[in-house]
């Protein structure tokens, strides 16, 4: 899930730049790839939350993923059949992203209050940072029409990814520590039997 998110966000970062779209042999295709990567990069993020944090009980996450898939499919159909430009439908994707991140953050806050899990806190902070970067970039895009709005969101995504990777690293270290402790206890138990 992390690898898919990293791949899709990386594709979006590269294909969303004006430089990539202007100097490629296929600018329309590059733009289309950018839109689809942006529309779908949240799907692996939601799967990560469900699988890593054991949030399978929250069916709203399945609904969110279905909405992301439906959004990409419907926008593709509208673009192909009715020639509606993707940029004119971008607001729908922004609203879905906003709803998804807020929903996930609220679920995490509730779960953290219940469990006080340190890994959850790191991931919750990552989503919080991405939510702030997302809202800030949306305001810059829709209200202020500031051209570097994408950079703000990209920085937010990079911080988000860094915190997720930190969470994975912390989890691996804790698992290694637990495994080492178990091996020591097993050795002690073996020595006691002798």
Where do the PLM segments sit?
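Amphipathic HAMP/coiled-coil signal-transducing linker helices
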Residues: 178-194
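Juxtamembrane interface at the cytosolic side of transmembrane helices
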Residues: 1-6, 11
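Interfacial "cap-and-anchor" motif at the non-cytosolic start of specific transmembrane alpha-helices
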Residues: 9-182
């Amino acid at each position: 899930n992390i690898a898919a998110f990293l791949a899709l966000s990386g594709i979006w970062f590269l294909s969303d730049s004006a430089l990539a779209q202007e100097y490629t042999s296929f600018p329309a295709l590059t733009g289309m790839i950018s839109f689809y990567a942006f529309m779908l990069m949240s799907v692996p993020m939601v799967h990560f939350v469900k699988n890593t944090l054991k949030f399978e009980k929250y069916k709203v996450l399945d609904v969110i993923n279905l909405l992301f898939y439906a959004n990409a499919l419907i926008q593709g159909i509208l673009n192909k059949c009715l020639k509606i430009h993707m940029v004119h439908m971008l607001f729908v994707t922004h609203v879905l992203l906003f709803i998804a991140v807020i929903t996930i953050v609220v679920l995490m806050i509730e779960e953290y209050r219940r469990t006080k899990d340190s890994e959850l806190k790191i991931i919750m902070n990552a989503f919080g940072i991405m939510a702030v970067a997302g809202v800030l970039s949306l305001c810059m895009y829709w209200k202020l029409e500031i051209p570097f709005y994408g950079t703000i969101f990209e920085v937010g995504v990079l911080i988000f990814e860094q915190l997720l990777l930190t969470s994975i690293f912390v989890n691996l270290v804790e698992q290694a520590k637990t495994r080492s402790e178990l091996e020591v206890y097993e050795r002690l138990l073996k020595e006691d039997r002798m």
